[in-house]
């Protein structure tokens, strides 16, 4: 038996068999997110002017963020399951391909046993999640990994990236990887991804001279004078530091050493936190959540005392499906599941951080 509701939401029926609500036939009047009728604000079915309202996406127009751009043509073809056989293999192994191009290491205890039983794929973690990044160059005698692959031994970059498939236990070895896809992704990121361009600039400087030491600074935030929602340029994402440098321990920027230093954790409040871990989902190196995103104050919208978008509100907006927004995220399959779990873990950590900081006991 299934519970179903009348169109006005007031009457409940017990219906035998399968319940089918059809496609999401409603859209938020502010951001265009698509919803089912049952997801509306309950008191709005006969609200002002008969307008049905939804708050799960943008809090009634308070949260305004840039829509995702259409992905580069190569990635768009790979994410289309009806395109060709190659795209189907890509979607099955999408987490493996993402691991090959990720700048950071995902630190989490992943429960692999849950998928040994029949049923749909589930991405489950236990405990805390964090992203870590190493040096620009590998230690002597060790192969390059993660961000180092954009800088070290790039003449053999394809081979180096595919060798990760054999070393990384998180790679889906049942489906394999295709060299043509890896080559295409390398070209695509070189042309489109601002983070990749910053690391390539470090490569060129390291390869063209013996200047030491060299560091790459990943900027936590853009200039306060920059338009809030404009696309970031490379100079707003990262900067190269040549010579001696005294690091400010209080700075939220991430300073990547040329060699050594071990793995360094990146704060989930850093604007590039997700783009560094999920280049497949953010092919242009788009910035993510950061502190200080203001609520929309246009029109008659009432804004509370806080006045800023929370991390939960940011991800609630980002995860919606909209008719006029690119579907790169929601076409990500298993990688999209991982991103959602990662985002929720960040939200929970941020809540705990607030409790600890504001504990008056």
Question: Which residue stretches match the model-derived regions?
Answer:
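Non-catalytic interaction regions
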Residues: 1-361
């Amino acid at each position: 038996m299934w519970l179903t509701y009348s169109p006005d939401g007031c009457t409940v029926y017990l219906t035998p068999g399968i319940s089918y609500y059809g496609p999401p036939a409603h859209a938020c009047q502010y951001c265009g997110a698509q919803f089912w009728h049952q997801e509306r604000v309950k008191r709005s079915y006969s609200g002002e002017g008969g307008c049905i309202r939804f708050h799960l996406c943008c809090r009634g127009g308070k949260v305004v963020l840039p829509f995702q751009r259409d992905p580069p043509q190569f990635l768009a073809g790979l994410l289309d399951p009806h395109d060709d056989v190659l795209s189907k293999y890509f979607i099955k192994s999408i987490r493996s391909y993402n691991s090959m191009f990720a700048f950071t290491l995902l630190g989490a205890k992943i429960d692999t046993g849950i998928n040994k039983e029949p049923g749909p794929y589930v991405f489950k973690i236990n405990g805390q999640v964090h992203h870590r990044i190493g040096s620009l160059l590998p230690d002597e005698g060790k192969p390059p990994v993660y961000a180092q692959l954009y800088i070290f031994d790039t003449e053999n970059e394809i081979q180096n990236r595919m060798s990760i498939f054999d070393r990384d236990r998180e790679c889906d070895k049942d489906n394999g990887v295709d060299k043509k896809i890896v080559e295409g992704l390398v070209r695509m990121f070189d042309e489109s991804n601002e983070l990749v361009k910053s690391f390539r600039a470090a490569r060129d400087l390291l390869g063209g001279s013996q200047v030491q030491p060299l560091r790459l600074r990943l900027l936590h935030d853009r200039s306060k004078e920059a338009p809030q929602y404009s696309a970031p340029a490379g100079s707003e994402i990262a900067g190269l530091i040549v010579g001696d440098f005294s690091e400010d321990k209080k700075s939220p920027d991430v300073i990547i050493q040329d060699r050594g230093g071990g793995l360094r954790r990146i704060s989930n409040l850093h604007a590039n936190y997700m783009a560094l871990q999920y280049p497949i989902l953010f092919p242009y190196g788009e910035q993510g959540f950061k502190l200080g995103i203001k609520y929309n104050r246009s029109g008659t919208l009432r804004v509370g005392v806080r006045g800023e978008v929370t991390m939960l509100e940011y991800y609630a907006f980002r995860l919606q499906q909209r008719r006029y927004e690119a579907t790169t995220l929601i076409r990500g399959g298993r990688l999209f599941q991982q991103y959602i779990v990662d985002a929720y873990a960040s939200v929970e950590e941020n809540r705990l951080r607030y409790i600890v900081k504001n504990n008056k006991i």
